[in-house]
């Protein structure tokens, strides 16, 4: 398969390739985990408060016991979904390529289609540069991780130097 065919094939089908080799690099964001914890505390506090106060005074509407438990129940559902979404992002790499798992999807890119990792100044997260000026945000590398993200980016760039094809 030529490089052009590989590029077209990988771009057209998100499940076109994957790697069976062991991963040499893996990164997640401790900052997003902290954001998730704070968000869940706020969501649950608001929903517990609403569940407690919904029936305190008579407003003309009938408020049943189930209504009082519905607010915290909705808060639990929102909290679980938030936790799953914010702790999901991950970046993995090996000699075959890079796997990016963001909030909504996972995608594998072979080294042949990657132009590098960049972290634009003022940006909240890094991104993988792709052909035709496209890029994929990498939620696993957040600027909120401060010194930790610098170490992770340097480690990733070491793999880039080892596996990315050289320009002709």
Explain the meaning of each model-derived region.
Residues 25, 116-117, 166:
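Short secondary-structure junctions
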Residues 64-67, 147:
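Residues at secondary-structure transition points
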Residues 39-49, 70-85:
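Single-pass alpha-helical transmembrane signal-anchor segments
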Residues 129-168:
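A membrane-cytosol interface segment of integral membrane proteins
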Residues 1-63:
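N-terminal membrane-targeting/pre-transmembrane regions
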Residues 74-110:
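Conserved beta-hairpin
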Residues 92, 107-144:
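Acidic, Ser/Thr-rich low-complexity segments on the non-lumenal side of membrane proteins
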Residues 32, 90-94, 101-105, 119, ...:
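Acidic/histidine-enriched, beta-strand-rich ligand/metal-binding domains
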